[in-house]
């Protein structure tokens, strides 16, 4: 590798990975509830293991949803439809342990500190306080058209295409569980120049050979996802490097909601506040705050105000306004952090109810985000991925 070059690696997983099964079940339940009761409070956690799904958490709503049916339908859609996979939508046990939201938390969310103290005029927006304290990050970079880091973008692309090859029976020996990983080489100007390593581990029928899997992935997977200009004779491929991946899914490993937070975001390329997304209604700033931070970051880059930017927002439980906003452009902007923050404060309402209104989050849009990443999804119409404020932001800041 040339001097001053460096490598960066990100991974993704398929929708059949145990942790992603759990995420998708949690978000499918959230969508079912929020479609009937947009103001519901949902914190839904799922764990999956051999032959068993446990759904637990705090849900406050006046509507009924058939949780066992949602669980089974989600598992079936993912592709676990045979008992020999060790996990089957029809025969797995489904247990539920659901409580209402704590009244101590509800008090602060129902009526924010600013509203309770009479310190705010904007009652409708100030009425909702943050559902918890915490810090969230949003990130954008001009490495890709989607304004995502290239390693995670390619890792997601491989995982999504692998799932498509399985579900369309193009490669009918594939089974639902899979992981992908891409290592990108960057030059001295921090621009991606080549792919150094690709790792794919995919569950498969026991009778297929590893040689056949490798041949098929080189024919049907890699050319469909990765630009050939990034590949060379030194690119390394590791396909099922253990030599066998027959036992997978919840039979191989237990899964839990919220254990793939780096896969869900930027593949480790940007910092993470630690809060997971799936199963949480939009009053939970772990989710809505991270979406808003991505929205801000993406519009900053789309406006040409920076080539790369990380936005941090932080909240106190029961308080509507963020306690802090931080913007780091890594030296790629001609404008100061304060100039950018002033423009963001002018255009983006980062109070919980403001985010919910700005991004129209009280809708059943979450199940589709629970696999293959929440950001950079050109295959979905996600409100936080829009760059509709870029021009207005540019006019505010560029004098």
From Swiss-Prot:
Assigned EC number: 2.5.1.6
Quaternary state and partners of this protein? Answer: Homotetramer; dimer of dimers.
So where does ATP get bound? 17, 177-179, 244-245, 253, 259-260, 276, 280
> What is the protein name stated in its UniProt record?
S-adenosylmethionine synthase
Query: Which terms under GO biological process does the entry name?
Result: one-carbon metabolic process; S-adenosylmethionine biosynthetic process
Entry's PANTHER family?
A: S-ADENOSYLMETHIONINE SYNTHETASE
Catalyzed reactions:
L-methionine + ATP + H2O = S-adenosyl-L-methionine + phosphate + diphosphate
Query: What residues does Mg(2+) bind to?
Result: 19
Tell me the organism: Listeria innocua serovar 6a (strain ATCC BAA-680 / CLIP 11262)
Write out the annotated subcellular location: Cytoplasm
- What does the entry's cofactor note say about binding and number? Binds 2 divalent ions per subunit.
Q: Which family does it belong to?
A: Belongs to the AdoMet synthase family.
GO MF entries: ATP binding; magnesium ion binding; methionine adenosyltransferase activity
Give the binding site residues for K(+).
45
Family matches, as NCBIfam families: metK (TIGR01034)
Q: What InterPro entries does the record tag this protein with?
A: ADOMET_SYNTHASE_CS (IPR022631), S-AdoMet_synt_C (IPR022630), S-AdoMet_synt_central (IPR022629), S-AdoMet_synt_N (IPR022628), S-AdoMet_synthetase (IPR002133), S-AdoMet_synthetase_sfam (IPR022636)
- Got a GO cellular component term for this one? cytoplasm
- Chain's role: Catalyzes the formation of S-adenosylmethionine (AdoMet) from methionine and ATP. The overall synthetic reaction is composed of two sequential steps, AdoMet formation and the subsequent tripolyphosphate hydrolysis which occurs prior to release of AdoMet from the enzyme.
Q: Where is this region: Flexible loop?
A: 101-111
The keyword Nucleotide-binding is annotated on this UniProt entry: yes
What cofactor does this protein call for? Mg(2+); K(+)
Look at the named UniProt entry and state the broad enzyme category this protein falls under: transferase
Please give the pathway this protein is involved in.
Amino-acid biosynthesis; S-adenosyl-L-methionine biosynthesis; S-adenosyl-L-methionine from L-methionine: step 1/1
């Amino acid at each position: 590798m040339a001097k001053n070059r460096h490598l960066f690696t990100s991974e993704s997983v398929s929708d059949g990975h145990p942790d992603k099964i759990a995420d998708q079940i949690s978000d499918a339940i959230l969508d079912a509830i929020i479609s009937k009761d947009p103001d519901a409070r949902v914190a839904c956690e799922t764990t999956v293991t051999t032959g068993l799904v446990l759904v637990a958490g705090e849900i406050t709503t006046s509507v009924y949803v058939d949780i066992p049916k949602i669980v089974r339908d989600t598992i079936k859609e993912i592709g676990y439809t045979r008992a020999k996979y060790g996990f089957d939508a029809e025969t797995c046990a489904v247990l539920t342990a659901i409580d209402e939201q704590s009244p101590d938390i509800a008090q602060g969310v129902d009526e924010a500190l600013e509203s309770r103290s009479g310190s705010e005029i904007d009652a409708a927006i100030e009425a909702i306080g943050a559902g918890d304290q915490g810090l969230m990050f949003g990130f954008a970079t001009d490495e890709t058209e989607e304004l995502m880091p290239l390693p995670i973008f390619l890792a997601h692309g491989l995982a999504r295409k692998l799932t498509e090859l399985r579900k369309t029976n193009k490669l009918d020996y594939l089974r639902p569980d899979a992981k992908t990983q891409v290592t990108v080489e960057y030059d001295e100007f921090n621009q991606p120049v080549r792919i150094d390593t690709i790792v794919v581990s995919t569950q498969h029928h026991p009778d297929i050979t590893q040689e056949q899997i490798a041949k098929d992935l080189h024919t049907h997977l890699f050319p469909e996802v990765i630009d050939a200009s990034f590949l060379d004779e030194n690119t390394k491929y590791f396909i099922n490097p253990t030599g066998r991946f027959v036992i997978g899914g919840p039979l191989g490993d237990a899964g839990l909601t919220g254990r793939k937070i780096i896969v869900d975001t930027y593949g480790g390329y940007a910092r993470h506040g630690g809060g997971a997304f799936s199963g949480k209604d939009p009053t939970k700033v772990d989710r809505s705050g991270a979406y808003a931070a991505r929205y801000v970051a993406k519009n900053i880059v789309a406006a040409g105000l920076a080539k790369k930017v990380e936005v941090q927002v932080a909240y106190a439980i029961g308080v509507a306004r963020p306690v802090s906003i931080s913007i780091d452009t890594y030296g790629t902007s001609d404008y100061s952090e304060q100039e950018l923050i002033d423009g963001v404060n002018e255009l983006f309402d980062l109070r919980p109810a403001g985010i919910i209104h700005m991004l129209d989050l009280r809708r059943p849009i979450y199940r589709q985000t629970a696999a293959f990443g929440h950001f950079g999804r050109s295959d979905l119409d996600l409100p936080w991925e829009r760059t509709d404020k870029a021009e207005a932001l540019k006019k505010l800041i560029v004098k």
